[in-house]
Amino acid sequence: MQKLIIFALVVLCVGSEAKTFTRCGLVHELRKHGFEENLMRNWVCLVEHESSRDTSKTNTNRNGSKDYGLFQINDRYWCSKGASPGKDCNVKCSDLLTDDITKAAKCAKKIYKRHRFDAWYGWKNHCQGSLPDISSC
């Protein structure tokens, strides 16, 4: 019985671990979450320069705010550091750090709808006019 409980805990922990995507793995995941094909190279570039395709990535900014996950979503405006979902995306920041990118994708699309790619410095500084090749994906 004790072995069964330990096995169940291991399975639960593995299911919520972070993930680092390959470039094509990221493309497939973004397609699965309904990202527009005509913007795909922009999204891939953004994610590569913001988080290196790592869902567990965090970054503390000079102003004390923190960015979370694949899309480096900021806690000042978009996600709540507390135990309850909140802010503009109505999501907990910790939910943006798992291998299930559903909530992160939904929030990133909301940010894009409001600010386009200009909301992300990784895109502004690295992706304008220089997008990755995803033709083999």
UniProtKB/Swiss-Prot annotation:
Listed A to Z, the keywords are: Antibiotic, Antimicrobial, Bacteriolytic enzyme, Disulfide bond, Glycosidase, Hydrolase, Signal
Q: What class of enzyme is it?
A: hydrolase
Query: Which cysteines does the record link by disulfide bonds?
Result: 24-137, 45-127, 79-93, 89-107
The record's section on Pfam families has: Lys
The GO molecular function terms of this record are:
lysozyme activity
The secretion signal range is: 1-18
Q: Please give a single GO biological process term from the UniProt record.
A: defense response to bacterium
Q: Which CDD domains match?
A: LYZ (cd00119)
Write down the EC number: 3.2.1.17
Q: State the superkingdom.
A: Eukaryota
Q: Which family does it belong to?
A: Belongs to the glycosyl hydrolase 22 family.
Q: What is this protein called?
A: Lysozyme
**What is the annotated role of this protein in its UniProt record?**
Lysozymes have primarily a bacteriolytic function; those in tissues and body fluids are associated with the monocyte-macrophage system and enhance the activity of immunoagents. Active against E.coli and M.luteus.
**Which organism does this sequence originate in?**
Bombyx mori
Q: Which InterPro entries match?
A: Glyco_hydro_22 (IPR001916), Glyco_hydro_22_CS (IPR019799), Glyco_hydro_22_lys (IPR000974), Lysozyme-like_dom_sf (IPR023346)
Query: Domain C-type lysozyme, which positions?
Result: 19-137
Residue ranges of the TM segments? none
Task: Kindly summarize what the UniProt induction comment says about this protein's expression.
Answer: By bacterial infection.
| Catalysed reactions listed for this entry | Hydrolysis of (1->4)-beta-linkages between N-acetylmuramic acid and N-acetyl-D-glucosamine residues in a peptidoglycan and between N-acetyl-D-glucosamine residues in chitodextrins
